[in-house]
């Protein structure tokens, strides 16, 4: 084995002691300096770029997501309920569990009738831009196509502006089955909670039916195009015959209430306009109609929607970001596109206010005059209308009869101080400067500047004049709607003209069926500020295709003021005022009247709104809001008791928190 020779170290030259000291100090400094330079190099070489930061962030999100998903799947199913109960206290049993313990069982078949926008719509035929969307939901679900291809989506969701039916080459149809409207979007229930509770006492698809329809169409056109009314008639007859002859309980919601009013006239009318069921069909097949949030007499919100494509929340957003909503930024679906699309939906005209000034009031009066708006929740279950002495506000009364006012001063002025200049004779024709509006045609372009100014100079519009206003600003749309809907009050219900289907969804121009054993319920929420009248102004934006907008600066800081962001509020469920939801069952149909010749029993059940106490309660079990009320335990229990064989006396007759009976007495209508 070879030897390893070590090299002899070289000897250092001797140095003087003084030099040794200096050398030692330098040697102590050099390692320190070298470590600093090494640290600088490592820092410079390790500096993160933007891509590194993004990757790190995405990695953290993914790891956190997978960790939370692991915990969610690992924890017991009862853990979320345990946490909720520890924070809020024990949860009450759902109505289905409670009534099952009481021994209630499924008896009468139940039919659900969804309202506007809550039912899913899917594509069956479309243009090239919609490739890959066959039988995919265009409305409901995730709404993914709104973001991916907004203009294509608007084109396919619009109807033909002349016929109110399908445009050439496009077929969009209602989703069928209970899944059509159980959830509007993932996690946002509509009918799902009611369906689940009914299942607890034995209901299933053989005795539950979702009467889905294309809610964009006029009611009669759902039969012309899809035979929806015929299928509803056949399904009700089938369920009654296969359930031992037990009559059906009908549960319509929102616009579905008007749709079923139309159906009750259609089913008994002779063919070809009607279903040919005969005058006793409703008496034979229907036990009760339990209307939820029914806009029997229309909603002021429909006027604002057709006039300026706004409601309260949209108006606030438009005021904050006018450039985004009033111009076609990045080719997004902005306000003009919304108006172009919704004005092709005939169904929106079904919810315009009915009864004119007789029902909704005039320049100096309204049924709700003296109503007090409350900023804070009242004690002892009081609603806002009860806050003042004898339900009368100490402040100057709100003129709810003025549905549209141009300026806050006009809304508050005495009738003698208002100088109207009639808009009906104004000459149209001078073009609006913004010629890009032709790409998003809304009929305002054809009015001209003179016509637009004439509308503002008329200053104030009551409910009856608001219909005239819409005829002026959108004559083609309203002409199409006039063939399907009417908004008046019948003088003689025996007149043969009321056999026309356009009157069938107006309870003031039709009779209820001859079915004395049938019951009609009006179930709705109260205690939430609800749109009743609007303060408008001319839109000064040169880029806007919509010349009018809600004047959001018309506002009163007082917490108890009824005027907020250009909107006068009244009691209701946030969408439907109490007057519209309750008047027919409170007075016009109560007992034997010309509108209810057989004396069908009517009941009012109001549910005082109680918002969820915290986020863990979701949308709440005591909500009175227009859609959230579908999860209200008290409402669900009332419906289930009637479906299980009960009647109005079993659920406590009327339950009223608002001033509906007092307000109804102020309406001078021949009964």
Swiss-Prot record:
Name this protein carries in UniProt: Phospholipid:diacylglycerol acyltransferase 1
InterPro entries registered for this protein in UniProt: AB_hydrolase_fold, LACT/PDAT_acylTrfase
Family: Belongs to the AB hydrolase superfamily. Lipase family.
Membrane-spanning residues: 55-75
Lineage: Eukaryota, Viridiplantae, Streptophyta, Embryophyta, Tracheophyta
A Pfam family matched in the record: LCAT
Topology Cytoplasmic: residue spans: 1-54
Keywords assigned by UniProt, alphabetized: Acyltransferase, Glycerol metabolism, Glycoprotein, Lipid biosynthesis, Lipid metabolism, Membrane, Transferase, Transmembrane, Transmembrane helix
Stretches in topological domain Lumenal: 76-671
Region listing for Disordered, in residue ranges: 1-46
Pathway recorded for this protein: Glycerolipid metabolism; triacylglycerol biosynthesis
Membrane topology: Single-pass membrane protein
Mutant phenotype after disruption: No visible phenotype. No changes in the fatty acid content and composition of seeds. Dgat1 and pdat1 double mutants produce sterile deformed pollen.
Tissue: Ubiquitous. Highest expression in young developing seeds.
Positions of glycan attachment: 161, 381, 434, 647
Enzyme Commission (EC) number: 2.3.1.158
UniProt-listed GO biological process terms: glycerol metabolic process; triglyceride biosynthetic process
GN (gene name): PDAT1
Molecular function as annotated in GO: O-acyltransferase activity; phospholipid:diacylglycerol acyltransferase activity
PANTHER family from the UniProt entry: LECITHIN-CHOLESTEROL ACYLTRANSFERASE-RELATED
Main location: membrane
């Amino acid at each position: 084995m070879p030897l390893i020779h070590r090299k002899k170290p070289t000897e250092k030259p001797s140095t003087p002691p003084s030099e040794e000291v200096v050398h030692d100090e330098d040697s102590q400094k050099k390692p320190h300096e070298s470590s600093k330079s090494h640290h600088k190099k490592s820092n410079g070489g390790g500096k993160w770029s933007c891509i590194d930061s993004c990757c790190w962030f995405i990695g953290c999100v993914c790891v956190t997501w997978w960790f939370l998903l692991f915990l969610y799947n690992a924890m017991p199913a009862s853990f979320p309920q345990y946490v909720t109960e520890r924070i809020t206290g024990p949860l009450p049993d759902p109505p289905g569990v409670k009534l099952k313990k009481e021994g209630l069982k499924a008896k009468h078949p139940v039919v659900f009738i969804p309202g506007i926008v809550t039912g899913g719509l899917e594509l069956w035929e479309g243009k090239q831009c919609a490739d890959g969307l066959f039988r995919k939901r265009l409305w409901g679900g995730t709404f993914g196509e709104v973001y991916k291809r907004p203009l294509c989506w608007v084109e396919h969701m619009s109807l033909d502006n002349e016929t109110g039916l399908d445009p050439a080459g496009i077929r969009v149809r209602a989703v069928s089955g209970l899944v059509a409207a159980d959830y509007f979007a993932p996690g946002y229930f509509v009918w799902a909670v009611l369906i689940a509770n009914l299942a607890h006492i034995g209901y299933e698809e053989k005795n539950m039916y979702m009467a889905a329809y294309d809610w964009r169409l006029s009611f009669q056109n759902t039969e012309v195009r899809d035979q929806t009314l015929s299928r509803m008639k056949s399904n009700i007859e089938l369920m009654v015959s296969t359930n031992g002859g037990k009559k059906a309980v009908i549960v319509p919601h929102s616009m579905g209430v008007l749709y079923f009013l139309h159906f009750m006239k259609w089913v008994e009318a002779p063919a070809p306009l009607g279903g040919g069921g005969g005058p006793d069909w409703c008496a034979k097949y229907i036990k009760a109609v339990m209307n939820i949030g029914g806009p029997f007499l229309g909603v002021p919100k429909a006027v604002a929607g057709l006039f300026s494509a706004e409601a309260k929340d949209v108006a606030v957003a438009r005021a904050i970001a006018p450039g985004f909503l009033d111009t076609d930024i990045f080719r997004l679906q902005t306000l003009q596109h919304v108006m172009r699309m919704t004005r092709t939906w005939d169904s929106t005209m079904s919810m315009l206010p009915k009864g004119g000034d007789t029902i909704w009031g005039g320049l100096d009066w309204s049924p709700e005059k003296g109503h007090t708006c409350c900023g804070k929740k009242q004690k002892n279950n009081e609603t806002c209308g009860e806050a003042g002495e004898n339900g009368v506000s100490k402040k100057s009364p709100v003129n709810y009869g003025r549905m549209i006012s141009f300026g806050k001063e006009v809304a508050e002025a005495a009738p003698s101080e208002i100088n109207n200049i009639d808009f009906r004779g104004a000459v149209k024709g001078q073009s609006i400067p913004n010629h890009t509006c032709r790409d998003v045609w809304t009929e305002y372009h054809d009015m001209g500047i003179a016509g637009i100014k004439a509308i503002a100079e008329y200053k104030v519009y009551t409910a009856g004049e608001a219909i005239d206003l819409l005829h002026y600003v959108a004559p083609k749309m309203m002409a199409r709607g006039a063939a399907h809907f009417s908004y008046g009050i019948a003088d003689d219900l025996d007149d043969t003209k009321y056999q026309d289907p356009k009157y069938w969804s107006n309870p003031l121009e039709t009779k209820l069926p001859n079915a004395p054993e049938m019951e009609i319920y009006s179930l709705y929420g109260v205690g939430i500020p609800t749109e009743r009248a609007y303060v408008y102004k001319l839109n000064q934006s040169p880029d806007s295709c919509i010349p009018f907008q809600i004047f959001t600066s018309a506002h009163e800081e007082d917490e108890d003021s009824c005027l907020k962001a250009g909107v006068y509020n009244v009691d209701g469920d946030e969408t439907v005022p109490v007057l519209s939801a309750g008047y027919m069952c409170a007075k016009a149909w109560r007992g034997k009247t010309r509108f209810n010749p057989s004396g069908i029993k009517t009941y009012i059940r109001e549910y005082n709104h109680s918002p969820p106490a915290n986020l863990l309660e979701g949308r709440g079990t005591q909500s009175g809001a227009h859609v959230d009320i579908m999860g209200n335990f008290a409402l669900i229990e009332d419906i289930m008791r009637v479906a299980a064989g009960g009647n109005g006396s079993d659920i406590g007759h009327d339950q009223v928190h608002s001033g509906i009976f007092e307000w109804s007495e102020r309406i001078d209508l021949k009964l």
